[in-house]
Each structure stands twice: as C-alpha cells, then as structure tokens.
Amino acid sequence: MKDTTGIVAAANVAKNGPNPSKGGSEEILTVARSRLNTAMTAFSETREDELDDLRFYAGSPDNQWQWPADVLQTRGSLQGQTINARPCLTINKLPQHVHQVTNEQRMNRPGIKVIPADDKADVDMADVFNGVIRHIEYISDADVAYDTACENQVSYGEGYIRVLTEYCDDKSFDQDIKIGRIRNSFSVYMDPLIQDPAGADARWCFITEDIPKAEYERLYPDAAPISTLMSLGVGDQSIAQWIGENTIRIAEYFYIEYEKHTLNLYPGNQTAFSGTPEDKMLREMFGKPIRTREADRKKVKWCKINGYDILEERDWAGSYIPVVRVVGNEFEVDGQMYVSGLVRNAKDAQRMYNYWVSQEAEMLALAPKAPFIGYGGQFEGYEQQWKTANTNNWPYLEVNPDVTDGQGAVLPLPQRAQ
C-alpha cells in the first residue's frame, strides 16, 4: 500500500535513520557527533592561537594582519583619515625564517625505507617493497604533501598527510595507493587522547569539508534531504557544526573497532585465529593448538557522513588510521593541549620591528626642510627658481651679487640653514 501521508516514512526515519537500508547506523552517527564535539572542545583554545599565528605569518602591507585592530584605529588607517594618519608599515621578515627551516626539509626530505629485521626477512623482498613505495610517492606527487605538512608544522604548529586509494581509471576496478596532501590542517580533528606524535595510536579521526548545499544535493541525490536532516537535529545543539546557512559539512570519519577472537599457537611458532582457513589447515597438520589466548582484533572503518546520515562506508585495508600528524611544539598545561610553531615566539619581535620602521618613516616625513639663507637682494629676479629649489632639480641657481660692505667685496652665496 502506498504511503501517501508520509507517516510511515517518518517513522522509518525515526527508527533507522534517514537511510532505511542502514538501520543501526544511528549509534555510529551519535558517537561520531559526540567525538567531533569532543575534538572541537579540546582543540578550541590552541587552534584559535594557531589561526592567529597563520594570519600573522600571512600578513602583508595590503591586509595589515600584523597590526592590532585597536592600534590601526588610533593611527587612522581604518578610518581613511589623511590629516592625522600615521604610517602602519608591514615589513614581514617571518617568511625568510620559516623558509630557512622548510628549505632544509626540501633538501633532505624524509624517506620511507624497508629494512629486513629478523631471520625470516628477505632482502630481495625488502628491495621490492622499497620500489613499490617509491612508485607510490612518484604517482602521488608526495613531495607536495610532505612540503605542505612541513610548512604548516613550522608556521603554526601542525600539519597532516593522508594515505588513500583511488581507482586507476574509469574502466577499472584496480586501485592505486596514494599519499595525499591536506592543505587545511584545521579541517582535521584527531583523537585528542593520542600520545604518539604522529597519531599512530589514534582511535578515530575526522577530515571535514564544508560544501554548498546545491553541490551537496548534486553529489548525493539519494541522501536524505537537508530539511530531513534539520528535523533530525531539532534539540541537538551540535547541528550548527554540520549545517550552516548556505553550506553543509561532509566528514570522512575513520574509527577503529575491536573484535574478540581466539588466537591459536601451533608448532613452529605458527599462529592463526580460530575459524579461519589458516587455522583449519594448521589443525589438520598439527592437531590441537599448543596455546590459545583471547585477542582484540583491530579493524579500521571508514565512512562519509553529514552528521545525521551515512553517505558512504567501507572497511579500510590497514591496521592504522591513514592520517599522519606532523607536529611542532607541543605542550600540555593543566590538561589542555597547546601546539605552536616558529611564528608564535617571533610575533612580538616582528611587531616591534614594524613599529620601528613606521616611526622612522614618520620622523623622516615630518622633518622640516632646511631653508636657504641669503642677503637681501640676492634673490631678486630669480624668485621662482629659489622657491622651487627643494622640489625641482634645477641644473643651476643664479643670484645677484650684493656689495654692501663698503669695500667692494662680494658677500657669500646663499647657504642652507644647518
């Protein structure tokens, strides 16, 4: 029977989420919203400082981001004043110091090298893996990803690199592994409880992107309408993090799930999980396992969400979340994490330099020009030349000799006041 009233559809949305084929996804979405809110709260203070560092680093004479707004108002730059305005020069010396570090990294880029580590390792196989890794870096333009992460790390404290897979072409099911660039580090929200500087122990991570609503509807025509998402978020204060006035946030959500499995040990230090084909084969060869233990088997999951609907989902073929963190200075103060780069401690020195050069320019501009001093009658007939002597580059200046000392001596030529 056709649901003409829409009541049944609304009930299904309330029960199974906006996508009926994905019943049970509501728990994943609830946890995802909670985790993103946790990350935003944990990083709110440090990222506000990092954003200020980035704006300061990108300061130029056009945007004047290196001058405090209240100072600009008092100096007249924001009010268009010309009578009492004072110069606010920006001589940005920070890029040269940042580039001293990043250029060193460009000359000595970190490389991935596979080294045989035990008696079972194969040197030839290690060389094969090294070749595969070099090929992945080549087809990915990995140098750009490394350089971007380093630039962000040095300038304001944190950069990110990601690993992803893409289909080789439109007519193939084969996929290439690639190393991707993350230009905007503020779009990444990683588990704040990590201890590893690269984030290898992260339990979850978000890579967010805000797209126009029209673009969202074009990319995901089968997803729940935006009006439905807004109705689902009624009473949820975090809805503003996902749905804006003209945009909607799409997030790649990586998370780790643990499953209990029994690990069996067989002669020759061979192991296999119970129920797997390898375990059945080893049981046929050796019989009962020597030892067993319960193990948490880790699986990395990936899904693309809008906060209230799962747009795509699949398993990630790896043991770690494929987002690598590149961190600068890292401090934990009273349980709050603070991250900074090279710019943070150079801001006051740069401000002081801007003040100095602005004051020097102001003093030179306001300094009076020394007038010419001469005797009466020496300038008669040449007044126009002498009135413009300090603005025009005359090839010569003429004067009248004024003999007044009674002895016929010519008085000295006009001179500038000292």
Regions found by a protein language model. Give the residues of each.
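Extended, charged amphipathic alpha-helical segments
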Residues: 265-418
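Extended, helix-rich architectural segments
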Residues: 1-312, 316, 388, 415-418
